[in-house]
Amino acid sequence: MKLRAVVLGLATLCTSTATFAGMVSTSSNLEFLAIDGQKASKSLGKAKTFTVDDTQSHQVVVRLNEIVGSGSNQSLFESNPVIVTFQGNAEDLVISAPAIRNLDSGDKFNQMPNITVKTKSGNAISAKVDVLKQEGLFPSGNVLNDLAEYNASGAVASVSKFTATTSANSMVAAPAGNAKANKGKVVVQGENVAEQQLQYWFQQADKETQTRFLNWAKSHK
């Protein structure tokens, strides 16, 4: 009996102190830009999943990408970065946004992002959602800097514990204008904004993507 009591006691203790991890994923039209104060890796961007601790608060920055319009009027809509703060869960979670069919819907989403967090079984998880305001020629390169400032501001979806982490991992912002800019190995110098953006994103891409882009550019001369 004593042995049984000891076993039951250990089992109860383990159950009460155990930490379970769940997976977080997104709907197909969302991509992770940052997770818990750190830039989302390229591999994570492809997998669109990461593991969370159910006892902790988590913060992600996501962006909605959607092809809108039809036929020859199709275009790519990219939303402003959106901050989503939520509590981890032992069950897998899905962060999702509705489909955007036209630019008007995209503008409405930018003004008031409709993003939900639910468990795989469909239960809604409380989440704080806010737009990460950005400025400059290459705003996506400033996500971590802007997020650090946001977390330090005490705004609705801010998490103060990520302020230091975000600041330490923040990227150097690419300057606007027609000047040369070094961002790692990235250098841009163009006659207009469009040319600078093309140079910037071309140098950000991997070799395979660069090759595909060059082939595409040749076919559209």
Swiss-Prot record:
Record keyword Signal present: yes
Signal peptide per UniProt: 1-21
Keyword list, A-Z: Signal
Family of this protein: Belongs to the UPF0319 family.
Record PANTHER family: UPF0319 PROTEIN YCCT
Name of the protein in question: UPF0319 protein CGSHiGG_02140
Species assigned in the record: Haemophilus influenzae (strain PittGG)
Lineage: Bacteria, Pseudomonadati, Pseudomonadota, Gammaproteobacteria, Pasteurellales
